[in-house]
Amino acid sequence: MSKFFYSSPNELDTEHQNENHNNQEPRLQSELLSTGNQVVQSPPLTERLHEWRNLLIHQYNVVVAEWSNLKSATKNEIDSGREYINRNVLNDPQENNRLLVPSSILSLGAFFCGRVLTNKNNWGYRSIVNRNPSILGRLLTSLPSRTVLPLALAGVVFNQLTPGTAKNACHTFERDFLSESFVQEYHRIWDQLYVQGIKQGSGQIGETFQNSLQNGIKSIRESISAINDDKKQ
């Protein structure tokens, strides 16, 4: 059996010669350009720089593609939101052209008025030691009042000036963002407390006051007529 199991002695000599030839290759290479300039470069370093350059270009292209996709998706979301608002909320041309901007400005002013009314510095809370707020000041500067009152004033002003847009906004919010059971319960409580309670009670009080006023005026007129008749007689 031969001593050289995997290869013959000639093959081993050839491999050693190739390795020696590769080791003897120069690590710097000179090249003469067409302009007459001579460039000296290292082939391994040049190859490595080409690899880094290609990798950097690839990463740049990936980032540019991702950024383009993100811009396109953001633009589509903005366009969809604008179309959704125009279709469901801002669908009254008269209010959009004439009343929407003034109503928004006045609603913002009402919001800041609510912030002023609920500011503690306007109701005697000057310092920790010297505090003398009134009952109305305590009521208006409470946490629920500071949270609800500015929004309520802004909502009332916006509803009075642009009722169609305000109604569409409330209906869209209830339909698309709240559960149906919660909306039904909310409307039931609202009807029970406000429509059938406060509103109906205030209407009855106003009607009673109006009837009393008319009866009083009628009795005064009858008295004046009776006095005039007595004077004529």
Curated annotation (Swiss-Prot):
The chain crosses the membrane at residues 99-117, 139-158. Residues 118-138 are mitochondrial matrix. Keywords: Membrane, Mitochondrion, Mitochondrion inner membrane, Transmembrane, Transmembrane helix. Residues 1-11 have a biased composition (Polar residues). It is found in: Mitochondrion inner membrane. Residues 1-26 are annotated as: Disordered. Residues 13-24 have a biased composition (Basic and acidic residues). The keyword Kinase does not apply. Residues 1-98, 159-233 are mitochondrial intermembrane. Its main location: mitochondrion. It is a multi-pass membrane protein. One of its GO terms (cellular component) is mitochondrial inner membrane. Belongs to the apolipoprotein O/MICOS complex subunit Mic27 family. Component of the MICOS complex, a large protein complex of the mitochondrial inner membrane that plays crucial roles in the maintenance of crista junctions, inner membrane architecture, and formation of contact sites to the outer membrane. Component of the mitochondrial contact site and cristae organizing system (MICOS) complex. This is MICOS complex subunit MIC27. It comes from Zygosaccharomyces rouxii (strain ATCC 2623 / CBS 732 / NBRC 1130 / NCYC 568 / NRRL Y-229).
